[in-house]
Curated annotation (Swiss-Prot):
Reactions it catalyzes: a very-long-chain acyl-CoA + malonyl-CoA + H(+) = a very-long-chain 3-oxoacyl-CoA + CO2 + CoA; (6Z,9Z,12Z)-octadecatrienoyl-CoA + malonyl-CoA + H(+) = (8Z,11Z,14Z)-3-oxoeicosatrienoyl-CoA + CO2 + CoA; (9Z,12Z,15Z)-octadecatrienoyl-CoA + malonyl-CoA + H(+) = (11Z,14Z,17Z)-3-oxoeicosatrienoyl-CoA + CO2 + CoA; (9Z)-hexadecenoyl-CoA + malonyl-CoA + H(+) = 3-oxo-(11Z)-octadecenoyl-CoA + CO2 + CoA
Membrane topology label: Multi-pass membrane protein
Start-end of Polar residues biased regions: 266-284
Region annotated Disordered, chain positions: 265-295
Phylogenetic lineage: Eukaryota, Metazoa, Chordata, Craniata, Vertebrata
Entry protein name: Very long chain fatty acid elongase 5
Gene name for this UniProt entry: elovl5
GO biological process, any: long-chain fatty-acyl-CoA biosynthetic process
Entry keyword set: Cell projection, Endoplasmic reticulum, Fatty acid biosynthesis, Fatty acid metabolism, Lipid biosynthesis, Lipid metabolism, Membrane, Transferase, Transmembrane, Transmembrane helix
Native source organism of the sequence: Xenopus laevis (African clawed frog)
Transmembrane segments: 26-46, 64-84, 112-132, 150-170, 172-192, 207-223, 227-247
Length: 295
């Protein structure tokens, strides 16, 4: 393992240059191998999990989901608040901000962005809950691509550009996740589920987030500072991929609804957001079928 660590990190350092010394020794950041391992394990579970559950009953995760989504809602709010106050304290420039001129605010933002990176590892649980509940239709290309890529991208961000212009996308995303995970948590409560009307607008907010992030990134290209230009090009490329995938999801979900899907909405079931469905209809239908067979 040590030989692998040296080989992988030596190649990355040669390709990207020296890492930011301010994050040296931080959990999971010194070596890329743990991040690769967690991603590979995630993809393996995505592949094997549905097959493992194929002949098993879905697991009810209702209580766990409420707690899990509440926790991520609070963590997202904490990150959003700390990033906004850190940017204000450091006098960050919206158009372009380098990684070394914010003083103590840079240190604060680096600390918060580490939590943002770590939250992407926690969010792998989203997919695992789908597998346990046998909601395999929710494990889409968009869902897996977004989850697997974000953890890896933010490992690189934290090691080379852990503050400065990197703040904007994480700030917007943290705010969106406050809305998104609060929706997930509430939709896990049957009494509240019929009153949730804002699922469609969360996806619209996500698309708006990507466009705004591209706009802010492009500003740094037009009015450059000392923030590395290569990271800006990569950021915009990644945003384009998300816009394409999320737009495709949005059109399929909201503009081409099947009659069965419309019936589900009329019956008050919670529908998909970002490839997620928080209804427990599949589990409940399974229980009903078992009872009918027993009778």
């Amino acid at each position: 393992m040590e030989v692998l660590d040296k080989a992988v990190n030596g190649y990355i350092d040669h390709l990207l240059g020296p890492k930011d010394p301010r994050v040296k020794g931080w959990l999971l950041l010194d070596n890329y191998v743990p991040t690769i391992f967690f991603t590979a394990l995630y993809l393996f579970i995505v592949w094997r999990g549905p097959k493992y559950m194929q002949n098993r009953q879905p697991v009810s995760c209702r209580s766990i989901l409420v707690v899990y989504n509440l926790g991520l809602t609070l963590l997202s709010f904490y990150m959003f608040y700390e990033l906004v106050t850190g940017v204000w304290e450091g006098g960050y420039n919206f158009f372009c901000q380098d990684t070394h001129s914010g003083g103590d605010a840079d240190t604060k933002i680096i600390r918060v962005l580490w939590w943002y990176y770590f939250s992407k590892l926690i969010e792998f649980m989203d997919t695992f809950f789908f597998i346990l509940r046998k909601n395999n239709h929710q494990i889409t290309v968009l869902h897996v691509y977004h989850h697997a890529s974000m953890l890896n991208i933010w490992w690189f961000v934290m090691n080379w550009v852990p503050c400065g212009h990197s703040f904007f996308g994480a700030t917007l995303n943290s705010f969106i996740h406050v809305l998104m995970y609060s929706y997930y948590g509430l939709s896990a409560i049957p009494a509240i589920r019929p009153y949730l009307w804002w699922k469609k607008y969360i996806t619209q907010c996500q698309l708006t987030q990507f466009v705004l992030t591209m706009t802010q990134t492009t500003c740094a290209m037009i009015w450059p500072c000392k923030f590395p230009m290569g990271w800006l090009y990569f950021q915009n490329s990644y945003m384009i991929s998300l816009i394409i995938l999320f737009t495709n999801f949005y059109l399929k979900t909201y503009n081409k609804k099947t009659s069965s899907r419309r019936k589900e909405y009329q019956n008050g079931s919670a529908s998909a957001v970002n490839g997620y469905t928080n209804s427990f209809s599949s589990l409940e239908d399974n229980v009903k079928q078992r009872k009918q067979r027993q009778n």
